[in-house]
Amino acid sequence: GFANGLHHKAKAKRVIYLFMSGGPSHLDLWDYKPKLSEEFGKDLPANVRDGQRITGMTSKQNSLPLAPSKYAFTKHANNADGVWGSSLLPHTAKVVKDICVINGTFTEAINHDPAITYIQTGSQIPGRPSLGAWLSYGLGTMNEDLPSYIVMHAKSKHAEQSLFNRLWGTGFMPSDHQGILLRAAEDPVLY
């Protein structure tokens, strides 16, 4: 990896990155939007869409009403500003001072697939190295006998939001920065 050639010492040794495709909405977990409660039921302003087409799921709707989260939010001590979290995460709220919540990610994609590709690789176009590959490249490894990182798939009857291989691949990077898929059933690794 690149870690030995850094011009400064890396602050992180490990990263635990949880991406739950098809999980709860950010609006129901960490992204507190009090204005949505005030605007509940009003139609989505045209300037929010900024001329973008509407997805197929909503194209036949006559209106696009705003709606807040159904869950209560409280502010938790984390830094000078604190972190807002919903009642869905009571146990995480107890350790929020020890984690990093990133609430600034944005994509122009209006559909899940290109948006997920952007979150995982930094580009809406498939084929770029994943976050795991970049972390492997930047941090190096503490053990050459273990994979750079692992990807865990949940066992599900529905695969609408499956984590495609291209979302955790190395793209143009060397294969030693490739993660290993752990299966949820039977043998975790097929060898």
Where are the model-predicted features located?
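Ligand-binding pockets and gating/stacking loops
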Residues: 1-191
